[in-house]
Amino acid sequence: MDVFYHIVFTPKYRRKIINNQYQSSLGEIFHRLCSYKGVEIIEGHLMPDHVHMLVSIPPRISVSSFMGYLKGKSALMMFDKHANLKYKFGNRHFWAEGYYVSTV
């Protein structure tokens, strides 16, 4: 039985960077990365300065390891796809440290 989690996380410096240009890329990246781990996105909302996700994570995966994977890989994939982001964020840090999580 999977557990449902509401997760919220933000870009570094809470920059309002998630706009039309990057929304579709992030959506595709999140869906691809989640499918690799067997995580189901029940609902997701990309806001200009943060991301809300309702996900179902298999019990064998901890929330912290999943979030490290999701934020780490999505940052690398965004920098590969949109090289201009490196100038805004430098050092390949797209997401801010930490996240909010609650069981549903």
Segments from the language model and where they lie:
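Basic nucleic-acid-binding interfaces
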Residues: M1-V104
